[in-house]
Amino acid sequence: IRSHYPENRLIWIAASTHLEDEIEILDAYAVLKQRHPDLMLVIVPRHPERFQSTTQACRNKGFQTQLRSEDGLSDIDTDVFVVDTMGELLEFYASSDIAFVGGSLADIGGHNVLEAAVFSLPVLVGPNTHNFEEITQLLNDCGGSFLVHDANDIIRSMDSLIADKVVRVRMGQSAYNLVKEHKGTVQMTMMMIDTIMNQKALPVTIQQKNYPEKLKKNEVNPE
């Protein structure tokens, strides 16, 4: 997937999003896009029934928006890319630079931050994380995430991550180290990721990230 993005683009994925998440994400992106024109937003709505409304919300904001189902992966050179298909979240995580994990600005209780952490991504997450409270707190404590409450927090956090690659790498490595240190806690996540990734070899540019050893053992197809 990453090979289809323009090389100079920084990819921010907003994963498993709900309406309340997307309101803040899109407000933040409107500001960030002005400051960082090469920033691309990938949105993966949590529920299929929201694919259409999410896409319309992006277009109402004036963003050039492409859909996974309609545009495939050819020439992804857009403001927002909406993943309106199922079963591809982890591959898009693997192709991204920064992650926001949804259900955490919405009063949903959050979703699994480890799915982003395992791909060495710095994570933005909201305060409503009671479904994954312990591991989300550990991720914050180890320096692998920023806690955000609204669009303004997102803008501040993203500005710092975009401006400093060293900070991005350090946070991503901290997130990945948490995965390694809590293998018992993440066993089910690892099994799921291993199963999905074994279905499709990772391209070289993606595999160069820090992945668990079981993912590194997958056969690599050159791009």
Label each region the model flagged.
Residues 1-223:
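Nucleotide-activated sugar donor-binding and catalytic core shared by glycosyltransferases
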